[in-house]
C-alpha cells in the first residue's frame, strides 16, 4: 500500500507553483522550508499564513516536511529513515502553495503530500525497522516538571488541532503543544510521549517514552545544543548549495551554541535522562518518484 493518496476530505491548494532552482542564495537566510496554518502566530515567521513555501532546499527535505520527519533525524540515520534515489538529495525545487481557506499546519502537510504525489508522482510506503533510539526514563529524583492544572480541557481533538502549531507565541487554549524559542522549549499540558517526540529534534535520534509516567505536565526547558544545529551545518556542506554560508557560521553564533548545555545535561535537572538502546523506528521508503515538468 502506498502513501500517495490522503483522505478525501483533505482540502487542496488554491494555487501551487513548483520551479526547479539551480542557483545559490546570496543570503543564507533566504533558505525557507515550512508550512504555516492560518491559526499560527509568530513574530519570527517569514512564511505567509495558509501556505507551504520552500526555497533553496533539496527535495528530500521537502518530502520530510510533508511527512513530519524532523531534519535532525535525516543525517544521523544515514538516509535510512527516508530512502530514495540520489537526485532527491541534490535537486532543488522552489514551491509556493497557497490554501484556499482556513487551514491548520497538519492539513497543509497533508495537502503538500497530495501535491508531491500529483506533480512528482511520488509513491511511498511506511515500514518499521529496528534502529538505534533513545529511551526517555526517570532518574531516582523523579520528574521535576509541575503537573498541569486538572481543570484544563485537553482531549485528543485538542491534540490533533494544536500539536503542529509550533510557531504560536501564546499557548492559550492549547494542550499537547510546544513553542520552541532559540533552543528553549515550553510545553503546555503535555504528556511524556509528547515530550519524547519533541526531544527527538534535539537529540538527533528517535526518543521513545519509557518513563511510565501518567498525566500531563507544564514543561519549561532551557536553551540547549540541538542536533539540528549540527545537521544544518552538515547539510550546507553536502547539499548542492554548499558554501552559501560556510560550515562554522557567524562567530557570534558559534559562541552562543558552545555556551549551551546538551539536551542530556539539561534533562538531568528535571529528573529525566536518555538511555541509548534499540527500538522500532518508522521509516519512509520511496517506491517511485519522477522529476516534474515546469509549470
Language model regions located:
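Beta-strand-rich assembly/attachment modules of structural machines
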Residues: 1-295
Amino acid at each position: 500500500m502506498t502513501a500517495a493518496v490522503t483522505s478525501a476530505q483533505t482540502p487542496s491548494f488554491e494555487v501551487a507553483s513548483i520551479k526547479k532552482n539551480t542557483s545559490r542564495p546570496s543570503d543564507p537566510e533566504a533558505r525557507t522550508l515550512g508550512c504555516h496554518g492560518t491559526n499560527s502566530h509568530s513574530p519570527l515567521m517569514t512564511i505567509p499564513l495558509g501556505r507551504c513555501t520552500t526555497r533553496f532546499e533539496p527535495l528530500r527535505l521537502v518530502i520530510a516536511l510533508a511527512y513530519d520527519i524532523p531534519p535532525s533525524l535525516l543525517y544521523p540515520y544515514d538516509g535510512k529513515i527516508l530512502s530514495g534515489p540520489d537526485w532527491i538529495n541534490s535537486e532543488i525545487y522552489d514551491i509556493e502553495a497557497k490554501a484556499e481557506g482556513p487551514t491548520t499546519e497538519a492539513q497543509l502537510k497533508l495537502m503538500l503530500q497530495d501535491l508531491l504525489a500529483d506533480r512528482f508522482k511520488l509513491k511511498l510506503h511506511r515500514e518499521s525497522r529496528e534502529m538505534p533510539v533513545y529511551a526517555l526514563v526517570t532518574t531516582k529524583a523523579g520528574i521535576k516538571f509541575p503537573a498541569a492544572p486538572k481543570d484544563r480541557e485537553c482531549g485528543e481533538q485538542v491534540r490533533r488541532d494544536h500539536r503542529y502549531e509550533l510557531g504560536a507565541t501564546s499557548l492559550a487554549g492549547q494542550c499537547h503543544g510546544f513553542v520552541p524559542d532559540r533552543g528553549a522549549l515550553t510545553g503546555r499540558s503535555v504528556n511524556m510521549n509528547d515530550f519524547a517526540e519533541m526531544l527527538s529534534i534535539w537529540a538527533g535520534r528517535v526518543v521513545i517514552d519509557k518513563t511510565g509516567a501518567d498525566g500531563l505536565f507544564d514543561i519549561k526547558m532551557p536553551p540547549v545544543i540541538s542536533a539540528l544545529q549540527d545537521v544544518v551545518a552538515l547539510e550546507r556542506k553536502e547539499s548542492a548549495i554548499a558554501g552559501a554560508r560556510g560550515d562554522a557560521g557567524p562567530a557570534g553564533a558559534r559562541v552562543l551554541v558552545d555556551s549551551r548545555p546538551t539536551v542530556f545535561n539539561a534533562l538531568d535537572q528535571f529528573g529525566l535522562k536518555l538511555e541509548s538502546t534499540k527500538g522500532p523506528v518508522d521509516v519512509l521508503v520511496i517506491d517511485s518518484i519522477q522529476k516534474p515538468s515546469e509549470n
